[in-house]
Amino acid sequence: MSQSVESRTRIKNERYESGVIPYAKMGYWDADYVIKDTDVLAMFRMTPQKGVDPVECAAAIAGESSTATWTVVWTDLLTACDLYRAKAYRVDPVPGATDQYFAYIAYELDLFEEGSLANLTASIIGNVFGFKAVNALRLEDMRLPIAYLKTFQGPATGVIVERERLDKYGRPLLGATVKPKLGLSGKNYGRVVYEGLKGGLDFLKDDENINSQPFMRWKERFLFGIEGVNRAAAAAGEVKGHYFNVTAGTMEDMYERAEFCKEIGSVICMIDLVIGYTAIQSMAIWARKNSMILHLHRAGNSTYSRQKTHGMNFRVICKWMRMAGVDHIHAGTVVGKLEGDPLMVKGFYNTLLETQTDVNLVQGLFFAQDWAALNKCMPVASGGIHCGQMHQLINYLGDDVVLQFGGGTIGHPDGIQAGATANRVALECMVVARNEGRDYVTEGPQILRNAAKSCGPLQTALDLWKDITFNYASTDTADFVETATANK
């Protein structure tokens, strides 16, 4: 029921009294708020300090991430402040936790500059995470309205065009990270690239921390690397690539490296998440103008995404990076050495690949999201995976993914080329089995053993790594579980 005119007038008068007024009474809490299609929505997991009411805590988060300060200021009257105040509109207890709550907050679209991740994040995560009223705070999910998404370019290339450029369909793409990360000379680096690609991989890649160090300057790496790409592509008759990391200390240096990457004929370049949101958007714009696939390594994300109660969930990073315009982003393996609950990872992949997602609490998706025709972003699975897990990887991750076997290629006893061949044969035999309608998940180990009878490198890899899997409990799991319901 709507408030009476007298009631609204009384509330408004109280709201502008001098001094400190609870955020909820200042207009940052509205349980009757009607969500607009143009609102930016955010859902926070909050742990209020002892004695702080959850509703007041949610209102404080809304206030401090929009227009509020600690006391009433008369200059509010010079603005459309009732419109611009963020509205906390719902607070739910977190299942299984006694001191945590989900706070839902709506933001007026005009609070954000068009096409600027830096501005969006300055509000949503800029100040509230240090707020004393909360013991811990985590941004779990966001709903970005179509009107706002249309101000971002989205992935520079997208999954469909990438496959067209590579002429590779119906299977995951295969890659590997050059190992060791640091210390190789340019010539030896190029040899690793050549061996891996000639053995059957689609891509080799730089790791996150190889830039331009004294043991190998960037131009040396690029020149030897592209030689390896070209020789392997000519030998295999396939389009091949190497992710040249153009990350540097300044945008000027990054543009210089990216331009050189284009000049030598590379189809793809790479940046790290740590360069920052504005730099990522700038490189994505450059990549689109120059028809370059842009790979993003999520270096640094676990410093704020891994813990359950404070920071932000990686699904939010997935959304922001799709908006920013990267074509690839590392998004988890489930079975590898890095953090990744199966349901959470599925939610990440759906966020990157679907044109529209519905609410799916078991995957951690708290809002429905229409992606406004932005291109799809290719997830990358890397970190502790090997060919013996191929049936699991395809089952969990599907076709639209780059499977990066670093140690699982370069650690092969018979050499890099043999490691690449083992991975390619494992992938091909599993895709064939799936396409034939076989239960490849259950039969996976036997399918691999059968293929290994005519592929020595695969047999050696299976003998070496067997069924190694990093079975550690995930620190970030779903708060909701699926329950069986009777059909009526």
Curated annotation (Swiss-Prot):
One of its GO terms (biological process) is reductive pentose-phosphate cycle. Its EC number is 4.1.1.39. It catalyses: 2 (2R)-3-phosphoglycerate + 2 H(+) = D-ribulose 1,5-bisphosphate + CO2 + H2O; D-ribulose 1,5-bisphosphate + O2 = 2-phosphoglycolate + (2R)-3-phosphoglycerate + 2 H(+). Gene3D superfamilies: Ribulose bisphosphate carboxylase, large subunit, C-terminal domain, RuBisCO large subunit, N-terminal domain. It is an enzyme of class 4 (lyase). The modification N6-carboxylysine is found at residue 205. Mg(2+) binds at residues 205, 207-208. The active site is at 179 (proton acceptor), 297 (proton acceptor). One of its GO terms (cellular component) is chloroplast. It comes from the Eukaryota. The record marks 337 as: Transition state stabilizer. Keywords: Calvin cycle, Carbon dioxide fixation, Chloroplast, Lyase, Magnesium, Metal-binding, Monooxygenase, Oxidoreductase, Photorespiration, Photosynthesis, Plastid. Its cofactor is Mg(2+). InterPro entries: RuBisCO, RuBisCo_large_chain_AS, RuBisCO_lsu_C, RuBisCO_lsu_C_sf, RuBisCO_lsu_fd_N, RuBisCO_lsu_N_sf, RuBisCO_lsuI. It is found in: Plastid, Chloroplast. Binds 1 Mg(2+) ion per subunit. Pfam families: RuBisCO_large, RuBisCO_large_N. One of its GO terms (molecular function) is magnesium ion binding. The keyword Amino-acid biosynthesis does not apply. Heterohexadecamer of 8 large chains and 8 small chains. RuBisCO catalyzes two reactions: the carboxylation of D-ribulose 1,5-bisphosphate, the primary event in carbon dioxide fixation, as well as the oxidative fragmentation of the pentose substrate in the photorespiration process. Both reactions occur simultaneously and in competition at the same active site. The basic functional RuBisCO is composed of a large chain homodimer in a 'head-to-tail' conformation. In form I RuBisCO this homodimer is arranged in a barrel-like tetramer with the small subunits forming a tetrameric 'cap' on each end of the 'barrel'. NCBIfam families: PRK04208.1 (NF003252). This is Ribulose bisphosphate carboxylase large chain. It comes from Guillardia theta (Cryptophyte). The gene is rbcL.
